[in-house]
């Protein structure tokens, strides 16, 4: 599952050359900004406040699902009793972020962000057990589970996890351009800590983009529309832990879990990652005024995403 993460953080540089667009600014930043303007480059105002929304739907690979702390009466059940196999898993998440950024150099922007992520994933799971691996009462329990599996009652069950939490992170953008063409590479680290469940989502994202900037007369002087294509790489590690009693168990699993978790001390641990780290991007940014712009971006292939933001620069 991803929230965040993932959490896309995009800053489109309005890099490009301009014949005669003096961009006076009293700020010390960006360093070497006056030199860049003297060479004919139009660069963004140094500071930015950005509000964004992102919606993601993507396929997930579940590495493991384990249950622990279970008992039948006073008899503890081994944590490896249940062999849980997860098939197709689909995750969806929504994230709202507030980002503050600054151009340190004309080619380098740094930023920090904080936000909120909520989402869910649905996995098709099958639960089995191997009686030959156990003795005594454990063998009898494993045999009963195996019979339920063979009957089909514990196969292809929809197992849903809901999550929400606070997302925070930081990153930087390298940007440059020639004529009206521009390129940038955005790199960031984000982490989502859950409000109810234990565990977290950590993501490292690298997004190269290349595009073209169109100039025209806007509502408040010269304006620009930028279009680009790119790709996104994400290295996401997701782990969900907590009490089994907090999960909304599917009807097929409720009798089994109720029998072995009467004291409510049962725990679960789910580890998973993305099936494909790469996806393609297309996007656009419209400079409404010198100080305000809006941006949207779509992702497709194995990860489908929609991103929209509004930004004030000063």
Annotated model-derived regions:
Residues 36, 82-86, 153-160, 193-199, ...:
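Extracellular loop and loop/strand-boundary signature of outer-membrane beta-barrel proteins
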Residues 228-314:
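Outer membrane beta-barrel transmembrane domains
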Residues 47-52, 106, 110-112, 181-187, ...:
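Transmembrane beta-strands of outer-membrane beta-barrel proteins
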Residues 21, 37-45, 102-107, 176-183, ...:
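Short loop/turn motifs that connect adjacent beta-strands in outer-membrane beta-barrel proteins
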Residues 45, 92-96, 162-168, 200-206, ...:
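Residues that define the transmembrane beta-barrel architecture of outer-membrane proteins
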Residues 51, 98-106, 112, 170-176, ...:
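Residues on the lipid-exposed face of transmembrane beta-strands in outer-membrane beta-barrel proteins
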Residues 19-92, 101-102:
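Short glycine/proline- and aromatic-enriched beta-strand/turn motifs that initiate or cap beta-hairpins
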Residues 53-59, 114-120, 176-180, 187-193, ...:
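Transmembrane beta-strands of outer-membrane beta-barrel pores
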